[in-house]
Amino acid sequence: MKGQEWYQEHDIAEAYDDKRFSRGGRFIDRREKEAVVEALSPVGEKRILEVACGTGRFTAMLADRGADIVGVDISEAMLEQGRRKARTAGVDGSIEFVQADGGRLPFPDDHFDSVFAMRFFHLAPDPQEFMAELCRVSGGQVFFDTFKRYSARSIYSWALPMGSRLYSEREVRELLVGAGLKLADAGHDFFVPYGFYRQVPGWVAGPFRALDTAVVRSSVGDRLASVSYWNARVSE
């Protein structure tokens, strides 16, 4: 997994949320959480697995909404942040954090109602292997995001310290078919790449986000977006 050693560092884990989701990054955080809630709802009493849960941004949020949730990450440093976040939110009793490799999940087949992974597939060395594993442990739904190959993201992706795998729609559909999944729904967002939002204060990012949203909702929005959200179902 790209970045595996990087994310094991405690100082990296401690600064992760602030570096990405403060300033203009809060618009990214808000949109990602909206996408997850929309895809997985209703979550009450649902058995959910989050793969690559990181600092527990989504894990704690879904537990607060009534989900019975397990968060998996390969980094113990990230899991420590997740446990801390869960305690602060008062939902630690509803979450189980497990250190494990997303390609070898320690759960039986069809163990969860829904499985999701955010900010995961751009780092996956073998996307097909990981997709098959997510499908294996899900009894119904797999939700995930990808960065689009033909988008503004491609302009700077090469310069990122760990690189960033980009996907065309055809590649994602092939991944789904290969894993035994059927696409139920897809959404696309962020013509302006994430990197911009992280670098500017909120008062600058706000107007850009409004313009960004208008572009994405236009007739050419799907083609210009840099992020895609994929909602798939396990094939019968």
Describe the predicted segments one by one.
Residues M1-V43, E45-G54, Y197, G206-D212:
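Conserved class I S-adenosyl-L-methionine
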Residues G163-G180, A186:
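Short alpha-helix
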